[in-house]
């Protein structure tokens, strides 16, 4: 594909294989709250599972950078993809009670290792100005997989959400497992990864963890980095708080399963039009400018969300378009901006530290989300709007870059 010709081997093969994960993954993640409700779990139980998942994700995240440096990006990605996705997919396929869901989500929490290792694997050998392209294509594939959710919606309408989702979980588990081994076969350890594996081969994990936390502490004094970290952390918190969105559409706004199944389609079409048609025609600007614009767009979408009348499909789709555009631009340029501002040899440790703070702030969100939704669903989404307004304030402190310099000193100068 011409689109991928200018990319190195790792991101090229990762992008080509990503649909194998994205198609079943997008469907099951979208319907997961309804699947748990169908199994008899209450709002509070669902929120509790989410919080426990985030708590253990926080624990695993503490060690993600050091483990990635010790085992290598490639090996870490394979091991924890199997633990975090292959095994839980098969457990979810047969989950009919709180405890099975809890076990599956506990295993899935190890995906925090993959968040660090996979991002390093696909980015470290890529030229800096091409990294936003890699993130954009991956985000587009994951979102674009949503065009298949209406098919799942039709099957759900005929056979019920339980049997349909159980089948998708099981088949998805088989496909994902095969994909993980194939991707491992066709990717290589990055040059930085090889160097760090040598440096950390005799280093204890706890010592490496302490070094990464010291590096993260320094970031609070870096004006070019600190606002980016805050935006990354808060935007992730918003994502966690949106967990009950699909339940809200069904229970409060009274949309049926067929309408709900088209929600990912609207999002996917919006993202593809943005990436393939609109963004290429925009004047090239800094990543900071795109992040600021995306926050404004997302805030507008959060306002529209609170104004959707019961059963109004047109207003629903308009809101989804605005939110999809804002979130796609935000995730693409936020992640690229963060990775580009981290030092060459510190990406794994620093990215892991940022992810740790993200997870720490999100830990209470699962249970809190369940409580807020149970008390007043509109209150939950009002809190999300407040967080977007806070992001608008933070974006005013994003520096307009003159040079794309690294902001963290190397290990050699520690």
Show where each model-derived region lies.
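C-terminal membrane-cytosol helix-exit motif in multi-pass small-molecule transporters
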Residues: 173-196, 392-399
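Intracellular juxtamembrane helix-capping segments at the cytosolic ends
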Residues: 113-126, 328-342
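Juxtamembrane intracellular "pre-TM" segments in multi-pass secondary transporters
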Residues: 1-11, 189-228, 411-414
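Helix-loop boundary and gating motifs at the non-cytosolic
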Residues: 2-58, 224-264
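Structural signature of the two symmetry-related core transmembrane helices
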Residues: 75-90, 289-304
């Amino acid at each position: 594909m011409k689109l991928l010709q200018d990319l190195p081997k790792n991101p090229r093969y990762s992008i080509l294989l990503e649909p194998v994960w994205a198609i079943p993954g997008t469907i099951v993640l979208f319907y997961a709250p309804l699947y748990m409700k169908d199994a008899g779990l209450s709002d509070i139980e669902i929120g509790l599972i989410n919080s426990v998942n985030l708590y253990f994700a926080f624990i695993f995240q503490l060690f993600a950078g050091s483990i990635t440096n010790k085992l290598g990006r490639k090996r870490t990605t394979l091991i924890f993809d199997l633990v975090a996705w292959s095994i839980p997919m098969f457990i979810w396929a047969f989950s009919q009670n709180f405890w099975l869901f809890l076990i599956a989500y506990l295993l899935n929490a190890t995906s925090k290792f993959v968040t660090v290792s996979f991002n390093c694997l696909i980015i470290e050998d890529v030229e800096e100005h091409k990294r936003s392209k890699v993130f954009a294509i991956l985000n587009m594939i994951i979102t674009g997989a949503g065009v298949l959710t209406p098919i799942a919606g039709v099957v759900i309408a005929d056979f019920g959400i339980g049997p349909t989702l159980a089948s998708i979980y099981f088949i998805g588990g088989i496909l994902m497992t095969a994909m993980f081994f194939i991707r491992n076969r066709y990717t290589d350890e990055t040059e930085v990864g090889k160097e760090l594996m040598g440096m950390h081969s005799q280093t204890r994990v706890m010592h490496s963890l302490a070094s990464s936390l010291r590096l993260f502490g320094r970031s609070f004094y870096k004006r070019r980095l600190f606002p980016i970290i805050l935006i990354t952390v808060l935007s992730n918190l918003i994502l966690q708080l949106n967990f009950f969105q699909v339940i809200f559409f069904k229970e409060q706004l009274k949309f049926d399963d067929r309408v709900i199944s088209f929600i990912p389609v609207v999002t996917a079409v919006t993202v593809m039009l943005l990436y393939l048609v609109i963004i290429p025609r925009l004047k090239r600007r800094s990543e900071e400018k795109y992040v600021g614009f995306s926050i404004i767009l997302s805030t507008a979408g959060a306002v529209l969300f609170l104004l959707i009348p019961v059963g109004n499909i047109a207003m629903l789709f308009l809101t989804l378009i605005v939110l999809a555009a804002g979130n796609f631009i935000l995730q693409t340029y936020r992640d690229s901006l963060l990775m580009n501002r981290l030092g060459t040899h510190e990406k794994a440790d620093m990215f892991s530290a940022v992810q740790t703070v993200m997870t720490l702030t999100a830990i209470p969100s699962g249970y809190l989300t369940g409580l807020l939704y149970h008390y007043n669903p509109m209150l939950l989404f009002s809190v999300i709007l407040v967080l977007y307004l806070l992001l608008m304030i933070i974006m005013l402190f994003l520096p307009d870059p003159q040079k794309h310099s690294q902001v963290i000193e190397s290990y050699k100068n520690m």
